[in-house]
């Protein structure tokens, strides 16, 4: 899980979702997991 100020899709499988006010990226590649903070 990477925590960064701006989350971006890193590949075509990445999905940007908003959960409880937190912007997250979920992907089948675990290296691409991110959250904003």
UniProtKB/Swiss-Prot annotation:
- Please name the GO terms of the biological process aspect recorded for this protein, alphabetically: translation
Q: Which domain of life is it from?
A: Bacteria
Q: Which GO terms describe its molecular function?
A: structural constituent of ribosome
Entry GO CC:
cytoplasm; ribonucleoprotein complex; ribosome
Name the UniProt key words of this record, in alphabetical order.
Ribonucleoprotein, Ribosomal protein
Q: Which family does it belong to?
A: Belongs to the bacterial ribosomal protein bL36 family.
Q: Which HAMAP family match?
A: Ribosomal_bL36
Task: Give the protein's recorded name.
Answer: Large ribosomal subunit protein bL36
């Amino acid at each position: 899980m990477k925590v960064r100020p701006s989350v971006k899709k890193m590949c075509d499988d990445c999905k940007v979702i908003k959960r409880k006010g937190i912007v997250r990226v979920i992907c089948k590649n675990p290296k691409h997991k991110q959250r904003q903070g």
